[in-house]
Amino acid sequence: ANGLDMGSIGAVFITHEHTDHCSALRVLAKRYGFKVYSSLGTLNALRAGNKLDPNTDADVITDEVVIGNMRVQRIDTPHDAAESCCYRVTAPDGKSALIATDMGVMLPDVRTAAEQSDFVVLESNHDINMLKNGFYPYPLKQRILSNRGHLSNEACAKELVNLVEKGTLRLMLGH
């Protein structure tokens, strides 16, 4: 990010091992020395895929961890990865944000965390008809449309209506 002192980053949380989420992880973690947190499955996949230097300080987050004065909660998500998750971050004043992308469906635990958050980033990945009629190979279409793929725009919209009805005021779409 523009103006961000990368050396001030103490920890990075990885949701899953797909390259679009961690392509620079190995280099940045080595250069700046921040700690990496993820699920055990993701950490093992990162190491097996040579996406994380063996000497990088890394730890498994099973439920939640406190970093400085922030509490970070891990919530499992359904995605075609080793052990994907999303994260809910809570500040000392109780304000919280949930970042939930790369999931085929909205599981009850993710929905509950979203309903309890002040700010929610939610995946809005594809228009179902455009995807079905698009140029992607059939196996990729099936992967995206599966319950371990990506949340459709329609499914996201239904979740957003629920969140607004529950009182969530700050929402952002993610991809």
Specify the residue positions occupied by each region the protein language model found.
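Core dinuclear metal-dependent hydrolase active-site scaffold
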Residues: 1-4, 61-119
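Short, charged/polar "capping" segments at the starts of alpha-helices
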Residues: 42-48
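Short, surface-exposed connector motifs at secondary-structure boundaries
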Residues: 6-9, 29-32, 93-94, 166-172
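Active-site neighborhood of phospho(di)ester-bond hydrolases with catalytic His/Asp-centered motifs
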Residues: 9-17, 37-40, 98-102, 121-123, ...
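Glycine/Thr-rich phosphate-binding loops of Rossmann-like dinucleotide-binding domains
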Residues: 22-23, 46, 107, 130
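Active-site metal-binding motif and surrounding structural segment of the metallo-beta-lactamase
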Residues: 1-38
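Cap/insert and terminal regions of metallo-dependent hydrolase folds
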Residues: 108-174
